């Protein structure tokens, strides 16, 4: 099978994908400078520095929904950042959204995503992990599937989770507001997505969550849910969005 990170994107040099910083001892302040380089937003650098000073490996979450056969070009930026955390001794947690992929992330969408079957998602998930390990150190990566907890929830538990978030909060999302203003429908299951992504952070006790700038709202929901659960809130680290060669 072709390496999807190189032939599919011929303009991307192999050195950009495979060149990583050497694993060398760094002080918390040095780690902060190294890890925040190239990010679009970090909320907050002060909190990240405090976590780095704890002297333990941090749990760094990156979630991907296997909605297509290949990892999106834009994921490589977050994967590279996750690799940087690995090289400093932190725990990379690659969360495969095998459950949320059947819903579809509404972030940045002007219309509802078409639903995927579970079989389609599982086939895609297998290729996603293979491709991710072209960047990540497989031996130092923890892989989790959010279907492991969401499929165990009963309706009472789902209602309890939903009660922690208001409709007003959900409608603060720019993409939802834009669709309302344009008279386009928003399906109720789409409103669930940020809550579910946020709950993922509670389940894996994330110290930091990585994502694109389009994920900012969802990651902030995770902070709120962690606070309600009495957990330390995750640091938000979002990366600039890169378009693929097809412009998406």
Regions found by a protein language model. Give the residues of each.
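Non-catalytic terminal extensions that flank enzyme cores
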Residues: 4-13, 17-66
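Short, flexible loop segments at the rims of nucleotide/cofactor-binding pockets, characterized by
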Residues: 37-40, 70-71, 121
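N-terminal catalytic cores of NTP/NDP-binding nucleotidyl/phosphoryl-transfer enzymes
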Residues: 45-106, 208-216, 222
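A glycine- and small-aliphatic-rich helix-loop capping segment at beta-alpha/alpha-beta transitions
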Residues: 78, 112-113, 161
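A general structural detector for well-ordered alpha-helical segments in enzyme core domains, enriched
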Residues: 78-81, 124, 128
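Alpha-helical recognition segments enriched in aromatics with Gly/Pro capping
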Residues: 93-100, 125-140, 145-248
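A charged helix-plus-loop insertion that forms the helical arch/lid used to bind
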Residues: 106-122
């Amino acid at each position: 099978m072709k390496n999807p990170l190189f032939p599919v994107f011929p303009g991307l040099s192999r050195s950009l994908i495979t060149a990583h910083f050497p694993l060398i001892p760094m002080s918390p302040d040095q780690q902060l400078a190294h890890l925040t380089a190239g990010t679009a937003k970090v909320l907050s650098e002060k909190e990240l520095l405090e976590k780095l000073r704890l002297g333990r490996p941090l749990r760094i979450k990156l979630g991907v929904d296997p909605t297509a056969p290949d990892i999106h070009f834009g994921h490589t930026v977050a994967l590279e950042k996750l690799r940087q955390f690995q090289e400093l001794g932190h725990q990379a947690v690659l969360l495969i959204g095998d459950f949320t992929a059947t819903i579809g992330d509404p972030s940045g969408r002007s219309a509802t995503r078409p639903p995927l079957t579970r079989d389609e998602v599982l086939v895609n998930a297998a290729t996603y992990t293979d491709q991710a390990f072209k960047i990540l150190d497989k031996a130092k990566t923890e892989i989790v599937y959010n279907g492991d907890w969401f499929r165990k929830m009963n309706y009472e538990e789902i209602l309890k989770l939903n009660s922690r978030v208001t409709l007003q909060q959900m409608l603060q999302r720019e993409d939802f507001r834009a669709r309302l203003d344009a008279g386009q429908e928003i399906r109720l299951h789409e409103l669930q997505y940020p809550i579910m992504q946020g709950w993922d952070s509670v389940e894996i006790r994330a110290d930091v969550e990585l994502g694109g700038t389009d994920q900012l709202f969802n990651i902030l929901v995770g902070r709120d849910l962690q606070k309600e659960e009495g957990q330390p809130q995750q640091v938000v680290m979002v990366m600039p969005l890169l378009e693929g060669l097809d412009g998406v």
